[in-house]
Amino acid sequence: MKCALVTGGSRGIGKAICKKLAEDSDYHILINYNSNKEAALDTLKQVNEFGNTGEIIQFDVADADAVKNALDSWMSNNEGSIIEVLINNAGITKDGLFMWMPAEDWHNVINTSLNGFYNVTNHLIQKMLSNRYGRIINMVSVSGVKGTPGQTNYSAAKGAIVAATKALAQEVAKRKITVNAVAPGFINSDMTADLDEKELKRMIPVNRFGEAEEVADLVSFLASKKSSYITGEVININGGIYS
């Protein structure tokens, strides 16, 4: 059984990615969630509606032991299965000016977005190398490419993943493993629900926020064999802002 794992797959962009992979591929979809089991089950239901299979898998990406235990348990119960596609989507924001930022807000964002990338990817990379195939797609952000005031912690985490994407891509390319990053701009989701879209869209050349499904379309392509000559890239999907 060939599988695709989407961390933070229960809501928002992660949910849209799970659904699009179910529509476009034959992968068994592993929907990771941390605490919202109800949302994860709803995503699974919609995956099944595409005629595809999937399951939910609970762990906090920031907790290295939890990641190891959950993935080792899954692998022991699914011998012969391989996770070919990894979408590192889980992340949190704790916005505020750096001068007033509590250490907790800094470390929580770094632990989830950056250390979470390490915890999951490092645990799966050996299997991909042995299998001589893989797709790793890291969800970053315009904040990680440009830097966003009020999001120094988030910008630092995502910026580090941008650099890690480029480095790791070069390390594993000969084994037919591609590593790319997708950098969304303003996308309609829980993370942007409190933003003033009317004001902000004036900055965006296409004059609107993006949709999670548009991001999922790009991710699905990068997860496919059609993208085999693309690696180490950061692809912006932002309506032209900051271009």
Language-model regions, residue ranges each:
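Substrate-binding pocket helix/loop in short-chain dehydrogenase/reductase
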Residues: 97-98, 105-110, 200
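Alpha-helical segment proximal to the catalytic Tyr-Lys
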Residues: 126, 170-174, 228
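Conserved glycine-rich cofactor-binding loop
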Residues: 10-12
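Conserved glycine-rich Rossmann-like NAD(P)H-binding loop of the short-chain dehydrogenase/reductase
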Residues: 26-42
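Residue(s) in the substrate-gating loop at a strand-loop-helix junction
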Residues: 141
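Active-site helix of classical SDR
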Residues: 121, 157, 165
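C-terminal substrate-recognition "lid" of short-chain dehydrogenase/reductases
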Residues: 133, 211-237, 241-242
